[in-house]
Regions:
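A short, N-terminal "cap"/entry segment at the start of jelly-roll beta-barrel domains
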Residues: 25-85, 90-92, 99-100, 182-186, ...
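N-terminal regulatory/effector-sensing and dimerization cores
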Residues: 81-179
Length: 364
C-alpha cells in the first residue's frame, strides 16, 4: 500500500539538514532540501552530454515500462518523493513540466525513469534522461533539474536507488573478478543506456514492496541484482569507481563527506586536501573534474542551501540562519544569497511560502 502522505511530508520537511542522520562513514548522505530556483551563479561554457538512442521502446520494452510505471504510480499518491519499505529506495511522481529548475543536493544513486523525462545540470554539465537511459550520481552533488516531459495524465514517474560504496565494491569483485578497467574520465554525474534486465529487476523489487516480509528478506537480493546489472552495462566501469579505494571518485567522495561535516567552519582548500591526504593542487583539480565545482564553491552552495532550509522549515530569520551556516557578515550572506537564488533571503522565503511549497522535491 502507498506510504501515507502525512509521513511523506514529515520526512521531506526534515531530510537534508546538514550534520544530522549520519549513517555512512560518519557522513550525512541523505538528500538535502530542494529549491525551486535556478542558481544564478553558473560556470560558463555548459557541456551537454548526449547518449545516442540504442534501445527500442516499442513492443515488449514499452509494456515492461508501462508495468513499472503503474507500480510507481501505486506508491506515489501525489507529487513528491516517497520512501519505499527498503532503506535507500524511493519513487517519484511529478505531474507537470517545470518552468524553473529544482535545486537539490543528492547522494550517490542511480535514477531510472519509467515515464517522462528530465534535464539535470551539475556545474557545466547538462544531461537528459528518460525511460531509455539511466542517470548515475557518483558522489554527493549540488544539482538542478527540470522536468521536460510530464502531464497530469502521464506524469513523470521515477525510481531512485542509493548506491552504497561498500556494497558497490563487493559486487564489483564479482562482476569484474580480473579487475575493472579505469575509465578515461571520472565525473560525478553521467547517463547511460537502460536495459530490459534492469527495468525487470526494478519492477520485481517494487512488486515485493506489497509484502513487508518479502521486502525485508528478498528485497536486498533484488537490490544486489539491480547493482550487478548496472555494473554490467557500458557505464559499469564508471559505476565501479564509486566503491574503488583511492579512485578519483572515491577520494572526492570522502572529501565531500568531510566538507559537509565542516561546511559552517572557515576551512581552506589545504585543509580539505589534507583530509584525503592529497596535495592542494591535485585535490582542487580532481575535485572540480568530478563535481564541476571548486571545493570552495561547493562549500558555499551547501551553506546557502542550508540557510534556505533553516529559514523555510525552522522559521529562522535571515540573521540567525546566516550565522548558523558560518557567515560572519549578514551583508555578505544577503549578497551571496541574492546572487545565487535571485532574490534577498527574507523576500525569497516569503515568496516560496506564498507559492505553497510543501515538499522538498529532492528527487532527481
Amino acid at each position: 500500500m502507498p506510504i501515507p502522505p502525512a509521513y511523506c511530508r514529515k520526512i521531506t520537511s526534515h531530510i537534508g539538514g546538514l550534520g544530522k542522520d549520519r549513517t555512512r562513514r560518519g557522513c550525512n548522505m541523505g538528500p538535502m532540501k530542494s529549491r525551486v530556483r535556478q542558481p544564478r551563479e553558473r560556470p560558463s561554457g555548459r557541456r551537454r552530454a548526449t547518449v545516442s538512442a540504442e534501445r527500442s521502446l516499442d513492443g515488449p520494452a514499452a509494456l515492461a515500462l508501462r508495468r513499472l510505471a503503474n507500480l510507481i504510480a501505486r506508491y506515489t499518491p501525489h507529487d513528491g518523493a516517497f520512501p519505499l519499505r527498503l532503506p535507500g529506495t524511493f519513487v517519484v511522481r511529478l505531474s507537470h513540466m517545470t518552468t524553473e529548475p529544482m535545486y537539490s543536493t543528492m547522494r550517490p544513486a542511480v535514477c531510472i525513469a519509467a515515464q517522462g523525462a528530465k534535464v539535470v545540470m551539475a556545474g557545466r554539465d547538462v544531461l537528459e534522461y528518460d525511460p531509455a537511459h539511466v542517470l548515475v550520481l557518483a558522489v554527493d552533488l549540488p544539482i538542478s533539474s527540470q522536468v521536460i516531459r510530464a502531464s497530469w495524465k502521464e506524469p513523470y514517474l521515477g525510481f531512485i536507488l542509493d548506491l552504497d560504496p561498500a556494497r558497490v565494491a563487493e559486487l564489483t569483485t564479482r562482476v569484474y573478478p580480473r579487475g575493472v578497467r579505469k575509465p578515461s574520465d571520472v565525473r560525478g554525474l553521467y547517463v547511460g543506456h537502460s536495459t530490459d534486465g534492469l527495468v525487470d529487476a526494478v519492477t520485481r523489487l517494487l512488486e515485493l514492496m506489497a509484502d513487508p516480509e518479502d521486502a525485508e528478506m528478498l528485497g536486498p537480493l533484488v537490490v544486489d541484482e539491480i547493482m550487478i546489472r548496472l555494473l554490467r552495462t557500458a557505464i559499469g566501469p564508471r559505476v565501479a569507481q564509486i566503491g574503488q579505494p583511492k579512485s578519483g571518485v572515491q577520494r572526492v567522495g570522502e572529501a565531500v563527506c568531510w566538507i559537509r561535516e565542516h561546511f559552517a567552519q572557515p576551512v581552506t582548500v589545504e585543509e580539505m586536501a589534507a583530509s584525503v591526504h592529497m596535495s592542494a593542487s591535485s585535490f582542487h583539480e580532481r575535485f572540480k573534474a568530478v563535481t564541476s565545482l571548486s571545493p570552495l564553491q561547493y562549500q558555499k552552495v551547501l551553506r546557502l542551501h542550508e540557510a534556505w532550509r533553516l529559514m523555510l522549515f525552522q522559521r529562522m530569520d535571515a540573521n540567525e540562519a546566516c550565522h548558523r551556516v558560518g557567515y560572519l557578515s549578514p551583508s555578505q550572506f544577503s549578497r551571496e544569497y541574492s546572487r545565487f537564488f535571485g532574490s534577498a533571503p527574507t523576500r525569497d522565503v516569503a515568496r516560496v511560502r506564498e507559492e505553497g511549497f510543501t515538499h522538498g522535491g529532492s528527487e532527481v
